[in-house]
Amino acid sequence: MKRLLAFSFYDVGNSVFPMIVVSALTSSYFVNQVADNPQTGTALWQLTIGIAGILIALLMPYIGTLADSVKNGRLILLRLFTVICIASIALFWFILPSSNYIILALVIFLIGSMSYEASNGLYNASLKSCSTSNLTFGSGIGFGSGYLGGVIILVILLQTIILPERNLLNIPTEGQAHLRFVHIILALWFLIFSIPLLFLCKFNNTNSEPKTKVATKIKNLIWNKGLTNTGRFLFARMLYADGLVIVTTGIGIFGTSVIGLSIKEILLAAILANISGAIGCYLYGIFFKNDKKIILYNLLFLIVVVAGISISQTPLQFISLAIIGTFFSGPLQSSSRVVMANLTPDNTQGFGFGMFTLSGKITAFVGPILAGLLTFLISQRVGFGFSIVLLLLGFFLMIKVNYKDT
């Protein structure tokens, strides 16, 4: 249980990057305070996310292979990329509200995004080493803790520094110093909660993995006179992950521009949704074990919820459905990494989760582009609802994956 606790603490720490840096505070600061105008800022921020995703998708199979082939390689590389990610968060303190800092901010964000994805892939590869024998339970506890950790630090920052006219630490607002200082707190939060996993745990990782070219390993993993079982899972995951990207990146915009929610209402909805996601992960982790069924059932539930959101008319309908949707999306993602862990031999967990990262990132830009085109040509409701197509395709391919919990 000590290892599982350390595993969960890491998720508490690293959740600040996707939740606060990518989606909330840092992105808003860059778009509204650093960039020349919000439209340009949004485009540059999203472009950087796309570039980082493609680069890390191509690199992760190599990083994972290196982690497998060197004694204690997974732990060493996890430490390295975690430290780089933490440093990149802290460096946003130096980004002043001026267009002179656009390039520096984007470079820091690019490095931070890539190091986050690399560290997260290696973190996922540690699931078997850190969890109990019930991987569904271990993964659910870790994923749920990440949701709660993000909510806790976000609420603390909102109440003490971001929202009050006079923040608790009396940090001046000139030069947006109070917003820039938040990044120091985020970096410390990530560092503190990552220490147990990085320095108090030992991974079951030796250098026994045979030497094979990465390209050959990729082919053997996904293709053998047709798609392999693992290949089917990775392609299924690629499809429904792309659908989730449309939902997660578009739901805030949908709420403000279509439903008419205020920023405070969006923040409240985000907090409630993340609490719901944590509850879902904990309940599924404790009471369920068949991860393939969890994925299939939750995809169906999500399809219904997304359809409901796309036709919702009132703030109450929208927020209620968003909360319900996160309850199912959390366990869906948690069980996905359990399936990958069980389909991958113990001595190639690094490579396996390198491919897992690739499957979630390599085409992640396609869904938002198609959704954007449908939004432009028809409506935002149709564009948002397009995610249902990808979720359905992922569902049907997932049915064909042969899987038994181990």
PLM region spans:
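Helix-loop junctions at membrane interfaces in 12-TM secondary transporters
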Residues: W93-V107, S310-L321
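Helix-to-loop junctions at the C-terminal end of transmembrane segments
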Residues: L58-N72, I279-K292, T375
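Juxtamembrane intracellular "pre-TM" segments in multi-pass secondary transporters
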Residues: M1-L4, K202-F235
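Intracellular juxtamembrane helix-capping segments at the cytosolic ends
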Residues: E117-S131, P331-T344
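Structural signature of the two symmetry-related core transmembrane helices
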Residues: I76-L91, K293-G308
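Short amphipathic helix-loop junctions that connect adjacent transmembrane helices
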Residues: M19-T42, T249-I266
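A membrane-interface helix-boundary motif in multi-pass transporters
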Residues: R74, I161-L188, L373-L391
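Loop-to-transmembrane helix entry/capping segments in MFS-fold secondary transporters
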Residues: Q39-A43, T132-F143, I263, D346-F356
